[in-house]
């Protein structure tokens, strides 16, 4: 399994012959190394409906005939835009041919702002547990610290956890460090920081708080499990 960080909350997973993107915010993302027109994707996983997470989902899904997996309301909304969907909800899991997906809770919001400035409610936000090739990945999405992260850590042997550290909209570094302790992941990668002025953080400072399990991935850098 190969994991690549593409800035903000964008994570690419390559496993079992499939290319999977989590929260493909590419167009308008000042940090990413990608161009949407060059991206190949088989599956898109979405944590919630905010524009900086849905990103290029519709155009990528249509171009690649990619399956979009998302919380029910968000998936339904995207189906009206002509994409293939698999709706899920918090606590539910499903085994696909490329791996097993389970949605966890997240403490955040979920809505999509249309070009005409209409705000569309898109259900509850989520985190994602992804299991494949004997490995477990946890992408927390956008979230505050919440005590059931302890339960997520107890129920899952997490190899890599992607945690937001930007503060303001999500956990900041101190809360994310507590989350890392509770999750008991073998490796913790900070995400959702430095994309915009309001979420400026020093990821190395965060890594120094979590006792040797943290790793800062440069934009476009990969790890193999």
From Swiss-Prot:
Transmembrane annotation, as ranges: none
Domain of life: Bacteria
Pfam family for this entry, one: Lactamase_B_2
UniProt keyword Hydrolase, yes or no: yes
The UniProt record lists the keyword RNA-binding: no
Alphabetical list of InterPro entries matching this protein: Metallo-B-lactamas, RibonucZ/Hydroxyglut_hydro, UPF0173, UPF0173_UPF0282_UlaG_hydrolase
UniProt GO MF annotations: hydrolase activity
Keyword entries, A-Z: Hydrolase
Entry similarity comment: Belongs to the UPF0173 family.
Name of the featured protein: UPF0173 metal-dependent hydrolase Aflv_0488
Species in which this protein is naturally found: Anoxybacillus flavithermus (strain DSM 21510 / WK1)
